[in-house]
Every structure is written in structure tokens, then in C-alpha cells.
């Protein structure tokens, strides 16, 4: 294999960084493109977003998958719990995202920003909350979080874009990178990798029934 698919490492290494967890598991069998800071890491997940991430074992695989991401050939699917009852069964958000003019540490919908496209579909409604399947065409920083907050349905637990509300006391936003689809860099086979929801996410959904 030319890559590792890390599923929920945060559950095992709660008090360590993703890099430490990867090094503990993979040792020296990693792509060197990212250097010591990001060994083998091909793409990113927002801080406190759970789920799957691809780590390349060699430079060829790293470059191949990076190119697939740039060409929008990698399909990313997320599961998100948002605040509010989303009326549409499915919809597309097409709003450019750039650095916030009010707070440079945050991102925001900005007419001068880069194109950002997010698709979502309702999986289940829980009164004041809605569970969504979210797919992104672009990979802007904080894209899903910014888009959902912009249309009035912020992600539960998002300390940055949800006005500080955290009604379930979760550590981070309830946004989970559920599935990745891409072409294997060597065999060219279609790959579909899934990371099940974390236990805390499942428990909160059970409470909402």
C-alpha cells in the first residue's frame, strides 16, 4: 500500500497531536514532502473535526493524491449536526470564502474570497437540530463551518462560528469526515474509505431521539 487511512486517531491519542500518532504507528515509512511538521499528511482536517485523513507512505503517492485533490477528483463526505431545523431536503451553497475583515483569525463569506461550493442533504431532523450529509467540491479553510453558519445553521459545538454555544459540552464541533473516495495511486482502483462516527457523536444523537 502507498498510503495509510487514519480513522479516528484522535480517539486513541486524545492528548497528542495527529503527527505524534502517525509517527507512533507508521514509524519511518512516510512521505517526506510535508517535512517534520506534516510527515506524509496529504490534506487537512480542521482542528477538533473528527474523521478520516490520508497519510502518504512515499513521495509518489503523496504527489498523486495531492494532484487528485487539486483536480477535484477526491470526493469528501462529512456528517454534521447543525443547530436549527433545516427546511430544504438538499441544497448547494455557492459562496466565496476569504479571511474575515473583522477578525483575521477567522474565515468568512467574502466577495473577494476564493470560490467555495458545499452540497448538503438532510439525513434526519431532531426538532431544534438537523443531521446533514455534506459534500464539498472545494477545500477552503473552515469551508463547511463558515457556509453553514452563514445560512443560519451553525455546527453544534463550533467555538469559532457558533457564537460560543456548546449545549452538549463536546470538545470541538460536531463535524465528522465520514468518507473519502479517490483513485489508488498505484493500482488505479477506485477507493472508498469510511470512518464510523465517534462514540460521543453517536451518544448525542441517541439523546436527541
Where are these regions (language model features)?
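Internal amphipathic helical hairpin motif
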Residues: 17-33
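Short helix-loop capping/hinge motifs at secondary-structure junctions, enriched
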Residues: 28-30, 60-62, 86-88, 187
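Single conserved hydrophobic/aromatic residue that forms the stacking wall/gate
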Residues: 1-13
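The conserved catalytic core of RNA pseudouridine synthases
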Residues: 35-67, 75, 79, 95-151, ...
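Signal for well-folded cores of large energy- and translation-related assemblies
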Residues: 23, 27, 69-70, 98
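RNA substrate-recognition surfaces in RNA-acting enzymes
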Residues: 156-185
